[in-house]
Amino acid sequence: MRTFTGGARRAGLAAGTLALLLSALPPANAADLAGGGPRWCPTVAGHRVDCGSLERPLVAGEPELGTIEVAYAVVRHRGPGAARGTVAVNPGGPGEVAIGKAAEFAAGLEGLEDHDLLLVDPRGTGKSEHLPCGVTDAEYRFGTRQEQRDAVARCARALGPRARGYTTAATADDIDAVRARLGVRQLTLYGLSYGTYLMPVYASRHPESVRAVVLSGAYPHDFDPLVRPSAQAVSLALRRVCERSVPKACDGEKAVRDLATTAARLRERPLTVPITAGGKTYRERFTEGKLANLMFEAASRGVGMDPAGPSLLGSAPRALDRFVKGDTGPLRHLVQEEGSSGGSEDQAPYIAVVCNDYRKAWATDAPLTVRWQQYRKALAGAGQGGFGAFSGQGFNEGPTDGGDVCMSWPRGNTARPQPTDLELPGVPVLVLSGDLDANTPDANGRLAAARFRGSAFFSVRNAGHVPELEPTGCVTGVTSRFIRTGTPGDTSCLQGLAPIAVTPVGR
């Protein structure tokens, strides 16, 4: 689910998801090897890189809507002889680029000297052909909830029937078309964040082409459309960071009470916070929903990447304490710091995929008035206890890929939701989750793992969204071993990562 990357999309737009960690790893020392392909083909030290693109139908079975170019890069293995396999990586989103992170991904999978790495930029992103709708990252991110819903409707109008071309199934089929062109018999699928939604769809549509699956920061296709696991995980993460802090920096129960008080005050009286991003200044109306987004999504990103350094999650207990005591400064600072990465990227690949595919709390074929009735009934039936420190309505105004944000996505010209009852192949599957991640919490990771027969699920202590970001190499060692052998081997290090630094509340 969505993660912002210094102005790019998540999830998925991620703070690079895996790529941020990988960019910190040492590059190969060997000279670059000559590859083949267009001028945009990336250079990866010590590896040959072959690139290309292929023309794909925008919407299968509707030739009148035209075609779209999908770009790919293959980072060839370093060792002698033929590759033992090919790993296809998707870093999240929807809409995160892959090819632009080729060097970082290759460094992160450096142990796989006998495997090739396949990177496909999803349609509408990176080196693939773009199909914009005129909604930017910053305006969507910083807008009020009504403005976000209006942006969704505007995006749909701009795309028209072409909106049907933005689906997870279409991206999965694009990847398989690339696989077929390359003559690769089977892929090991590696999905991060939204990639954990995409790769099972690929596996269900092309089971004979799947060798194994790795999912990191996972969630199931039939996830709760009211996002209750994430709401509850925010409180759990606050309790855990306080409990594990050395020396003890905060009281977890007090931090949760402070969060509830902050949410209630913002529900009644939002803040106005100026945010500078991309050379522009925006005035964000910081509501309970914006607090929810800050705490479940942004605060989960990059946790554990630098355990001793500052982080949003580690700073949150003190900021909440100060807010309750009348000092809004620390919380404002966190909002401004997190928002500074807002950018100008077009959000069509993000908005259209989540509004076409994701499960909703209403019938997508219902008229707008009925949708609102069904949504409000679902919220009322959920009760208040299921949303942790937040109100149900307030929390559901936080997700940019859920809650009520797709309410105005039209019935006409759009795709049917992605089916949730996937038939999946019986291949080796590894699922990882960070136990401080409220974006794709352990509860959702376990549900995602349960969809595969015989899968292995591991919760990584003191890690956030996409645990490969941790710096010791423990997690990437486990995943590399799994890709090579089909088993994770010794996983004891997953419970031994250092706790994150927490700003003392007393200061």
Where are these regions (language model features)?
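Secretory targeting and sorting signals
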Residues: 1-31, 54, 175
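Flexible "cap/lid" loop of the alpha/beta hydrolase fold
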Residues: 219-237, 321, 328-343
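Structural motif
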Residues: 274-294, 300-302, 340-348
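Short helix-capping/linker segments at secondary-structure and domain boundaries
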Residues: 297-321, 360-366, 487
